[in-house]
Amino acid sequence: MRKLLAGCLALCIPALLTAQTPADSISRTETIDSVVVTARRPLMVYKQTGNIAVDIEQLKYAPLFAGEKDIFKFLQLLPGVSAGKDGMSGLLVRGGSNDQTLILYDDVPIYNQAHAYGILSIFSGETVQSAEMSKGYISPAYGSRLSALTQIRTREGDRRNHRQSLTVGTLSLAGTLDGPIKRDKGSYLISARYFFPEAVLAIADNAVRYGFYDVTGKLTYDIHRNHTLSLGIYSGDDHMKNKEDHAENGFGWGNTTASLRLESRWNDNLRSSVVAYYTYLQNRQETKFKDDGFSNWGKTTFKTHEFGARMTFDQRLSHIWMLEYGAAFSHQRFEPMHTKSIINGQHKNRGYSSEQLVSGALFLNNRFQWGGWRADVGVRGAVYDNSEQTKYAVEPRAQLSYDFGRDNSVWLSGTINSQALVQFNRYYYSMPIDFWTPFRDGRLQHAWQVSLGGRAKLHENLTLSVEGYYKRMRNLPLIYDSDDFLLSNGGFIYGTGRAFGIEAMLQYQTERLSLTASYTYTDSRRRSDGVTYPFEYDVPHDFNAFVSYDVVKRPGRKHTFSLNVAWRSGLPYRLTNESYPDTDGNPIIGITAYPTMRMHNYFRADVSYNMERCKRNGVRNWQFSIINATWHKNPVSIYPYRGSYKATVLIPIMPSVSYTRTFGK
């Protein structure tokens, strides 16, 4: 079977030769207009203990954010995973914070996955090939985070045909080109998009201007029949400006990544993968003021650089024993704050000393598989050096599972993880302008987790998965005021954490209908200075459901309706409850160190209608979506207002439309 274009297939069926017939004796031929092969895959598939893969094909039917497809919105549907605030692109897993989830984009660490202040992620739906999350057993090949591993992979270009696609959304424009470099030997892929809400803001006579762009590229080439080389790049940037009378303020942030990978097949039992990468994150803030002969310009930047490499070998020692082993290295440099200013022509520079972290790791995993049994036993040994201290970590990991038959299995796992990085929240919740720093005071963060789960096929089309977990964390750094921390260059306040919960996911599949529903009960706590309190993203009850139905399904044409519903408990919140005057007598509002209340429960319903049609030279697709169709007001923050309090709502009702045209076979 050869794929020609999304939604259309060319089927080549070999004929079995049973007799010889002269060609000139064949009286006629029959041409079949089309052959339709239909099958539905579940939205999410459990691969092993606590590890879930997302079906990227379903992404094109999901409701759009401002006309954009976002894989992170799918990942946030997973049980045990939360976005944090409404509309955010965070991945908070099993009582962990966003910085405790390792996000890899083609094996390159990503330090800021947000566009549009977190409403969208940096991963374009046009380029993503696969997305997997590990929140139970994590391969020893990966470490440096406490909670989870998320791997996003970019698809390769087509090796036989050149293709082009153009997508016009409500506030965005995207284009993708891919095709062969040399037929059946190599391919290229380049994709770019631009988000331009400033057009709407200008019509509304708003002083705020905002937009973002990103570019993704990938080259793949078989330098030998057993060796494939690939080069991947990504660059993206967000910018926002606000003009008022004599002043102008701006924010911005961006990622740049590059990776070079060599995959080799040495023989039937040995394969290897070597990747070298670079990742860069910069956040910036800029102010301008000019009035009555006084002028002021200032710019503050925060930067994170990382160079790294990883070598992995997969070796089959026998029909029941597979070995995975290798090494990893990284060098990170953090520039926490550098300020340039010009005041009435006088130049001033101020910066804090940069910090660095050098990390190395060796890892080994033994996989045994016999009958229905499967066992993984591995260990990761890591060393971290921050120029002042060197710390070592040994992380054993193990899992055991038994498969009773198709879609019926049980599993048990235990993991130990360590982390040497800390993400600063410039405010008391995660924002794209946060920055990173290495461990201090000789303390690495540590966590251990045990989980037990199973999957059962209740009916031909109905599957239920259930998993429970218990996790402990220690040496968690708590920072209440990042500016004071930078000024004093001091240490952290440390605490401990505990989380447990049970996760359930129900999936129902027919030829036309796909339903995935998940429920999570969890209890996440933190303890510091003798006080135990709810984790700021603790959500005791969390329910998500995604359903898609093919309203029209016939050769060359498909209409799909989809609905996504989310309900969860309100988040704990640190209420501003006191104020004190500054030197000019203006009130400064204080924020408590611990949550003192919970916000209202969260609810959101998103709907979408997708119309896809195959053309002679490609595919045409229209998609209409409404985010928060019920216009439910979900607060993201609370602030004092005239002796009382008001809530800030980020996501109102958001209708959008998207048109995609694909050309090529």
Language-model region placement:
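C-terminal beta-signal and adjacent terminal beta-strands/loops
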Residues: 566-585, 600-604, 611-665
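Periplasmic N-terminal accessory/gating domains of Gram-negative outer-membrane beta-barrel systems
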Residues: 47-99, 107-138, 155
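Gram-negative outer-membrane beta-barrel transporters
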Residues: 470-472, 492-572
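Outer-membrane beta-barrel signature, preferentially recognizing the C-terminal barrel domain
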Residues: 246-265, 302, 353-357, 416-473, ...
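Structural signature of Gram-negative outer-membrane beta-barrels, strongest in the C-terminal barrel
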Residues: 318-322, 328, 351-472, 518, ...
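Surface-exposed extracellular loop regions of Gram-negative outer-membrane beta-barrel proteins
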Residues: 239, 282-284, 338-342, 388, ...
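Transmembrane beta-barrel wall of Gram-negative outer-membrane proteins
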Residues: 171-196, 205-239, 250-278, 317-323
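Short, acidic, small-residue-rich periplasmic hinge/interaction motif at the N-terminus
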Residues: 20-63, 98, 265
